[in-house]
UniProtKB/Swiss-Prot annotation:
This is tRNA uridine(34) hydroxylase. It comes from the Bacteria. One of its GO terms (biological process) is tRNA modification. Residues 120-214 form the Rhodanese domain.
């Protein structure tokens, strides 16, 4: 059994580059894999590994400047969710194209237990800050879908649509809390006064709120091998198209357009014959590695 920890924390790192090697060393020593991003505005990532290794990494992060209040979401997985460890430097821990925002000036956190009451209020507009392919498999009842392909598209979407939300309070949510928290900082910079975000994101809501009281509909896409989870963070029967990186259901896998690692109904007409030939070769190498009991990994970070 693997422990999976999803985390982020906004704080000011004077020299994030200096934090990279020690963090990587602690993770490697504990057999922890996954992805961690360091930037001047903080840290973000999802990691998986044995209990002792995860505890060591989290303790190290909590000891970093301004990170004593670090919070994270835990779940478990029966298979290793990540094949390798990446610790990378970025200009933002979540790319919005707005690195100058003050992450300390954000909207009001709303606990999962209080979320239903907020989003049911008639003067509240609920906005899903995730990408379109994530929203497709699940969202909150009545939420606005910006239909963005990337989080970087959100500022432009807001500028084009903000007139729709005049005189309304704004409630925003995302997978683990980081995108909606940064979105509230952006909206506050734009002059929106009453803006809220779901503390801990959808994952915390699904963990805390009983299914019979939930306003969540469908599954929640996650960026690891589980692909999607539901209430209680139980894994759902979704897979990932390795060609377009979008979630696919059992029904879509039964479609004639689906070929493992090569195409799915969504991307069948998007990629060229040359692309598909390359994907087939990659899939062949993955199968050969699996038959030998080896992991098919790219170069380390």
């Amino acid at each position: 059994m693997y422990v999976v920890a999803a985390l982020y924390h906004f704080t000011r790192f004077a020299d994030p580059d200096a934090l990279r090697a020690p963090l990587r060393s602690i993770a490697e020593a504990g057999n922890v894999r996954g992805s961690l991003l360091l930037a001047p505005e903080g840290i973000n990532g999802t990691i998986a590994g044995p209990r002792a290794g995860i505890d060591a990494v989290l303790a190290h992060i909590k000891g970093l400047p301004g990170c004593a209040g670090l919070e994270w979401k835990e779940s478990t997985a029966t298979a290793a969710p990540f094949g390798k460890l990446k610790v990378r430097l970025k200009t933002e821990i979540v790319s919005m194209g707005a690195p100058g925002l003050d992450p300390a000036d954000v909207g009001t956190h709303v606990a999962p237990a209080e979320w239903n009451a907020l989003i049911s209020a008639p003067d509240v507009a609920v906005i899903d800050t995730r990408n379109a392919y994530e929203v497709e498999i699940g969202t909150f009842e009545g939420a606005v879908d910006p239909a963005t392909e990337s989080f970087r598209d959100f500022p432009a979407w807001w500028q084009a649509n903000k007139h729709r939300f005049a005189n309304q309070r704004i409630a925003m949510f995302c997978t683990g809390g980081i995108r909606c928290e940064k979105s509230t900082a952006y909206l506050k910079e734009q002059g929106v006064e009453e803006v809220f975000h779901l503390k801990g994101g959808i994952l915390k809501y699904l963990e805390d709120v009983p299914e019979d009281q939930s306003l969540w509909q469908g599954g929640c896409f996650v960026f690891d091998e589980r692909v999607a989870v539901g209430h209680g963070l139980a894994e759902l029967p979704f897979d990932l198209c390795r060609a377009c990186r979008h979630p696919i259901s059992c029904e879509e896998k039964a479609d004639l357009a689906f070929e493992e690692g090569v195409s799915c109904p969504r991307c069948m007409d998007v990629h060229s014959d040359a692309d598909r030939a390359r994907f087939r070769e990659r899939q062949k190498q993955i199968a050969l590695a699996k038959a030998r009991g080896e992991a098919h990994l790219g170069a380390g970070d």
